[in-house]
Regions:
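Membrane-interface helix termini and inter-helical loops of multi-pass transporters
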Residues: 1-5, 38, 68-79, 110
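A generic, lipid-embedded transmembrane alpha helix
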Residues: 48-68, 129-131
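Alpha-helical transmembrane segments
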Residues: 3-21, 77-92
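Alpha-helical transmembrane segments of multipass membrane proteins
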Residues: 18-26, 89-97, 128-132
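Juxtamembrane boundary at the C-terminal end of a transmembrane helix
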Residues: 133-140
Length: 140
């Protein structure tokens, strides 16, 4: 019975940490894109912003999953390493976004929240997923 309780505690801790990292991912995308992300997606139904946010969430989820899956036997060390890898993944995705913005014409953030579909959205989403895949491979 204590194994179940112990497992529930660990699952709750990792789950809460994962949720915090996902929320930080939402905040990060909201900071990088002009305007209010929630309003753009839920009220204005902006597909471009939704694709960028979705790719960031999938990326963060993949990083957290890989970090938990390959975690240390020591619970505390595993929890800290998951937090650190998750935060590093967020930083790396932000840096990749800023580099992409630097090397492409115009302001990438403004382009990504246009109402009309734009190919830059798919490039940005792919960049998020690629950075996350590299992070996952590095963790594993």
């Amino acid at each position: 019975m204590s194994d179940i309780v112990n497992g529930l505690g660990r699952t709750t801790a990792y789950g809460a940490l994962g949720l915090v990292l996902l929320v930080l991912g939402i905040v990060l995308v909201d900071i990088l894109l002009p305007g209010r992300l929630g309003r753009q997606i839920w009220e204005e139904r902006n597909r471009n912003a939704a694709v960028v946010l979705s790719s960031a969430l999938l990326g963060v989820g993949g990083i957290v999953f890989t970090s938990i899956w390959t975690t240390y036997d020591d619970f505390g060390k595993g929890l800290v390493s998951t937090a650190v890898f998750g935060l590093l993944g967020l930083v790396m995705m932000a840096v990749a976004f800023l580099v992409l913005d630097l090397i492409t014409p115009g302001r990438l953030g403004a382009t990504l929240v246009e109402q009309e579909p734009h190919p830059a959205v798919w490039v940005t989403a792919s960049c998020n997923l690629a950075v996350s895949a590299v992070m996952c491979a590095s963790i594993a």
